[in-house]
Regions:
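Phosphate/diphosphate-binding loops
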Residues: 140, 188-189, 196-197, 204-205, ...
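A conserved beta-strand->alpha-helix junction
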Residues: 113, 118-121, 292-303, 400-418
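PRPP-dependent phosphoribosyltransferase catalytic core
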Residues: 142, 157, 194-200, 352-454
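Secondary-structure transition/capping motifs at alpha-helix termini
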Residues: 109, 130, 264-268, 286-293, ...
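Flexible loop/turn segments at secondary-structure boundaries
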Residues: 65-66, 96, 168-169, 190-191, ...
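Short, glycine/charge-rich flexible loops or terminal/linker lids adjacent to PRPP-binding catalytic cores
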Residues: 289-334, 345, 372-378, 382
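Conserved short alpha-helical segments that host acidic/polar catalytic motifs at enzyme active sites
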Residues: 1-203, 208-267, 273, 361
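Generic beta-strand/beta-sheet core signal
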Residues: 89, 154, 162-163, 174, ...
């Protein structure tokens, strides 16, 4: 069972690179390993062989949006309580985490982490003490949670999967040839472990997997408008995944085709920034008739810069990660496609790489609108202060990053990426589906003693 979880984590490594963990359930006895690092750094062959065979497992690769990058914040989180035990893995971000944690602490709760996942674990545990089953406890807990959460919860006898009522973050499940059920954030992980995709877990749904098979419950949260994160299609998800019936690859190609119409330019070649800019670049090239060219070689052994903790690390990683191909770039007018500009740091260095390689012109096109507002639902941008589009015009940003021109995907065209208007685009327009918190920083539970109560 640990091997299956391990390969699934490998397929989802792009979603989080800070830490990872696996918990295996061997007839009610939990065995676990969690640590900071990539999947191949945390788990050796010997580590995997030490796990019992087990009947169930939960695994997680972390991209922190609440709480720092510490070993204590590694997931899955394990809890022992009066009625048993559980292991919990969570993707998303609770928008009412501060209020919930304050309430729990006033009631005597002692927290061992600074992540919002432990808050979920506490609330489920409280509910479990007064509930006939773990699924009833989770259902009760979900009525108190606000924001984004796709989670998997393992008890001694059951595996539960749940998605928040808005469906912010993806979650799906499949089945292997031997009858093993597999739940994952993306369908690409199902393919990686040989599981056939069954369906996406619906917003507000709890699925219960046990010895009797699988059953569904959606009677607890009420109907909410679907608000899937549009940034999943633009950046987070792997291109070979299908989320809520929409191909990520197709959505990105659509973005490129739209950009070719809304921001045309005379150029010799279209190039994409690896990896999430490539599909949009193919769409731009196909729609515009400008040839697509390979402009960069990517170092496969370094992580994604946008989701790496700390700005200083991001600056160092860009040049190590990407190298421009001079033969493709020299004396060319280039349309450069990337998925987003958040802080501007990465874009400036990428444009500079092309200039150093001899590019005549660099026209940057972005397959998303300007990032104007913080995200409270699982993207690590917690302040307008860090968003370049909040402080500069498009022309000024082009000058700052060194591009000859700059064009963003119009917000009005987002619906044409996925053929629906049922998405959250609050990071672009400030329209939040849920109440937003007063305290938003990622490290809000980690302040020094001298900084508290100010």
């Amino acid at each position: 069972m640990a091997d299956l979880a391990y390969y699934g984590l490998y397929a989802l490594q792009h979603r989080g690179q800070e830490s990872c963990g696996i918990v295996v359930n061997d007839d009610g006895v939990f065995a676990s390993r969690k640590d900071i690092g990539l999947v191949n750094e945390v788990f050796s062959r010997d580590d995997l062989m030490k796990f019992p065979q087990g009947r169930m497992a939960v695994a997680h690769a972390r991209y922190g949006t609440t709480g720092g990058n510490s070993r204590a914040n590694c997931q899955p989180i394990e809890v022992n309580h009066q009625k048993g035990k559980m292991a919990l893995a969570h993707n998303g971000n609770l928008s009412n985490a501060y209020e919930l944690r304050s309430e729990l602490e006033l009631g005597g709760a002692i927290f061992h982490t600074t992540s919002d996942t432990e808050i979920i674990a506490y609330i489920v545990t409280q509910a479990r003490l007064n509930s006939p089953s773990i699924e009833n406890a989770l259902s009760s807990a979900m009525s108190r949670l606000e924001g984004a959460y796709s989670l998997v919860l393992m008890s001694a006898a059951k595996l539960l999967a749940a998605r928040d009522p808005y469906g912010f973050r993806p979650l799906c499940y499949g089945k292997t040839l031997d009858g093993t059920y597999v739940v994952a954030s993306e369908s690409c992980a199902l393919s990686a472990v040989g599981a056939k995709f069954e369906r996406d877990i619906l917003p507000g749904e709890i699925l219960v997997f046990d010895e009797n098979g699988v059953r569904s419950n959606r009677d607890h949260c009420g109907e909410k408008p679907r608000r899937s994160c549009i940034f999943e299609y633009i950046y987070f998800a792997r291109p070979d995944s299908v989320i809520d019936g929409v191909s990520v690859h197709a959505a990105r190609r659509n973005a490129g085709a739209i950009l070719s119409k809304t921001h045309p330019v005379e150029a010799d070649v279209v190039m994409g920034v690896p990896d999430s800019g490539i599909d949009a670049a193919l769409g731009y090239a196909e729609a515009s008739g400008i040839p697509y060219g390979m402009g960069f070689i990517k170092n496969k052994y370094i992580g994604r810069t946008f989701i790496s903790p700390g700005q200083d690390k991001r600056i160092d990683q860009v040049r190590i990660k990407l190298s421009a191909i001079s033969e493709s770039v020299k004396d060319k007018r280039i349309v450069l496609i990337d998925d987003s500009i958040v802080r501007g740091t990465t874009s400036r260095q990428i444009v500079n790489l092309l200039r150093e390689a001899g590019a005549k012109e660099v026209h940057m096109r972005i397959s998303s609108p300007p990032f104007m507002h913080p995200c409270y639902y699982g993207t690590d941008v917690d302040s307008r202060e860090n968003l370049i589009a909040c402080h500069h015009s498009v022309e000024e940003i082009a000058d700052i990053i060194g591009a000859d021109s700059l064009g963003y995907l119009p917000e009005s065209e987002l619906k044409n990426l996925i053929g629906s208007e049922n998405f959250c685009s609050a990071c672009f327009n400030g329209v939040y589906p849920t109440p937003i918190p007063d305290v938003i920083t990622k490290d809000r539970f980690e302040g020094k003693l001298s900084e508290r109560n100010k």
